[in-house]
Amino acid sequence: MIAVIDVSGNNLTSLTNALIRLGGHFALTHDAEEIQKASHVILPGVGTARSGMTALQQNGLIDVLRTLTQPLLGICLGMQLLLEYSEEDDIPCLGLIPGVAELLKAERNHPVPHMGWNNLHWQKTSSLQQGLNNSDYVYFVHSYALKADDYALARCQYHEEFTAVVKKGNFYGMQFHPEKSADVGMVLLNNFLSLESTC
C-alpha cells in the first residue's frame, strides 16, 4: 500500500488520479501506523514551509517520517521539507537530506515563481531515470529550491542551476510535479513505486 500523506487539506486530485492510472493501491492518510506499514510513502506539498512543518508536527508525523526505512518521495514543497532548513519563513525542516531551500533569484527573463515546463539534466545513474532521456521536460511551480549538490540525481537550469531530483538513502525528492508532467511524470512515479521496499 502507498501512503499519500494528507495533512494540509490540499487538492491532491492530480496525484491520486496519476496513482489510479498506475494501478497503485494507495490511501490518503495522516495516521502514523498506516504510514509506517506502507510500502512507499509520498509527501506532497502546496503552501509554505511553515504551514507544512506545522501540519506535520500537529499530526505527530515528524519523528515518524525521520525513522522510515521504506522509499519516501517528497514532491515540490514536500521535497523542500525533507531538507535541513528553508529560507522561506526561516524554519528548520525534517533534516533527512542535507541542504537549504533558498529563494530563486528573479531576473528579467526568469521571473519567480518558476512556473512551467523545463528539462531535466541527469547527473547520476538512477533507477528513477529508467525509460527517460536527458532532455525530458517536467512541470515546475516553485519559488524556493535546493542548490545543485552531490545529492542531486538531476538538475535544472533556470537562470541558475538547482536540484530537480534528489536522493539520500531511501529519501527522494522531486522539485517539480510528476503528476502534472504528462508521460514523463508517469514514468517517474512508476519508477519510484517500483523501488524495493523494506516493509
Swiss-Prot record:
<dbReference type="InterPro" id="IPR010139">
    <property type="entry name" value="Imidazole-glycPsynth_HisH"/>
</dbReference>
<dbReference type="Pfam" id="PF00117">
    <property type="entry name" value="GATase"/>
</dbReference>
<keyword id="KW-0378">Hydrolase</keyword>
<keyword id="KW-0368">Histidine biosynthesis</keyword>
<dbReference type="GO" id="GO:0005737">
    <property type="term" value="C:cytoplasm"/>
</dbReference>
<comment type="pathway">
    <text>Amino-acid biosynthesis; L-histidine biosynthesis; L-histidine from 5-phospho-alpha-D-ribose 1-diphosphate: step 5/9.</text>
</comment>
<dbReference type="InterPro" id="IPR017926">
    <property type="entry name" value="GATASE"/>
</dbReference>
<feature type="active site">
    <location>
        <position position="179"/>
    </location>
</feature>
<protein>
    <recommendedName>
        <fullName>Imidazole glycerol phosphate synthase subunit HisH 2</fullName>
        <ecNumber>4.3.2.10</ecNumber>
        <ecNumber>3.5.1.2</ecNumber>
    </recommendedName>
</protein>
<dbReference type="GO" id="GO:0000105">
    <property type="term" value="P:L-histidine biosynthetic process"/>
</dbReference>
<dbReference type="GO" id="GO:0016829">
    <property type="term" value="F:lyase activity"/>
</dbReference>
<keyword id="KW-0315">Glutamine amidotransferase</keyword>
<feature type="active site">
    <location>
        <position position="177"/>
    </location>
</feature>
<feature type="active site" description="Nucleophile">
    <location>
        <position position="76"/>
    </location>
</feature>
<comment type="function">
    <text>IGPS catalyzes the conversion of PRFAR and glutamine to IGP, AICAR and glutamate. The HisH subunit provides the glutamine amidotransferase activity that produces the ammonia necessary to HisF for the synthesis of IGP and AICAR.</text>
</comment>
<dbReference type="InterPro" id="IPR029062">
    <property type="entry name" value="Class_I_gatase-like"/>
</dbReference>
<keyword id="KW-0456">Lyase</keyword>
<feature type="domain" description="Glutamine amidotransferase type-1">
    <location>
        <begin position="1"/>
        <end position="199"/>
    </location>
</feature>
<keyword id="KW-0028">Amino-acid biosynthesis</keyword>
<keyword id="KW-0963">Cytoplasm</keyword>
<comment type="subunit">
    <text>Heterodimer of HisH and HisF.</text>
</comment>
<dbReference type="GO" id="GO:0004359">
    <property type="term" value="F:glutaminase activity"/>
</dbReference>
<dbReference type="GO" id="GO:0000107">
    <property type="term" value="F:imidazoleglycerol-phosphate synthase activity"/>
</dbReference>
